[in-house]
């Protein structure tokens, strides 16, 4: 019976891959399980996708350095969508699409965060650099352990730091982050502000989105919108799930995400 089930699943996968010509996947909570690992079943399916010549593109709020090891593990040779669409790099990690925050806005924002709550960890991402005041600070050290990237210490008084900011990440206790979000949304309506989880507040240009970055790569791959598959689990995945020909929400997806998807899978722990 198990052999029959496996054959049926393989036929189903083959039929799907005939229809869809590019796959875009979020990383945390989608591709990776709670141990920040790729389930073996998922790994096998992605390697088969690669063998079929179908681009498998990682899409994340992460910086490029936080994604390259995962791409290498999957043996994928595709561009990557970073900072939730604010930066796209090609197969050689060269920037091919960039949407940065205005310098004055980024500088004013970061200074305002410290005024509102000095306990908040402020992290600036510019191209493939992660800038912090203190890399030994609790939240920065924890993020470094998760992503495998070591931040660079700089003075936030230096205006050059804000020259090409793709993302600002604020980390802290969930109560502090909730209060910060509420205040910043009022004061900075011209930029995109959202919580990727209770303790993380992501901030970037209003012009940056995962769906816009996918739209650009659609032309790069010479595929149609209806030939695109997208997998996600969180609020910042909603626009790409809606955009894709087949949008899939993971079983662990937020309740607000599942209704916008065509279908949803069982929890990401299983690798399905």
Predicted region positions:
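Short, Lys/Arg-enriched N-terminal segments with co-localized hydrophobic residues
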Residues: 6-16
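Asp-based phosphoryl-transfer active-site loop
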Residues: 21-34
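Active-site phosphate-binding/coordination module
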Residues: 35-139
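Conserved acidic, metal-coordinating active-site core of Asp-based
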Residues: 112, 116-231, 235-238, 252
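Single conserved hydrophobic/aromatic residue that forms the stacking wall/gate
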Residues: 264-267, 271-272
């Amino acid at each position: 019976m198990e052999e029959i089930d496996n054959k049926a699943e393989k036929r189903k996968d083959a039929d799907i891959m005939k229809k869809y010509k590019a796959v875009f996947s979020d990383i945390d909570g989608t591709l990776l399980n709670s141990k920040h690992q790729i389930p073996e079943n998922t790994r096998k399916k992605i390697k088969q996708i690669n063998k079929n010549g179908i681009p498998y593109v990682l899409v994340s709020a992460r910086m490029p350095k936080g994604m390259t090891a995962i791409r290498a593990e999957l043996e994928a040779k595709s561009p990557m969508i970073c900072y939730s669409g604010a930066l796209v790099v090609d197969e050689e990690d060269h920037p091919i699409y960039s949407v940065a925050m205005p310098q004055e806005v980024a500088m004013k924002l970061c200074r305002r965060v410290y005024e509102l709550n000095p306990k908040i960890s402020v992290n600036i991402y510019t191209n493939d650099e992660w800038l912090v005041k203190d890399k030994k600070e609790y939240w920065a050290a924890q993020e470094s352990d998760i992503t495998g990237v070591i931040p660079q210490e700089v003075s936030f008084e230096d205006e050059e730091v804000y020259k090409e900011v793709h993302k600002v990440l604020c980390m802290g206790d969930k109560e502090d982050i909730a209060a910060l979000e509420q205040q910043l949304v009022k004061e900075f309506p011209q930029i995109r502000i959202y919580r990727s989880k209770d303790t993380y507040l992501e901030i970037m240009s209003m012009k940056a989105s995962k769906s816009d970055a996918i739209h650009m790569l659609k032309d790069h791959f010479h595929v149609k919108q209806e030939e695109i598959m997208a997998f996600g689990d969180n609020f910042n995945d909603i626009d790409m799930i809606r955009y894709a020909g087949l949008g899939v929400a993971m079983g662990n997806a937020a309740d607000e995400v599942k209704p916008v998807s065509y279908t949803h899978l069982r929890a990401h722990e299983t690798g399905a």
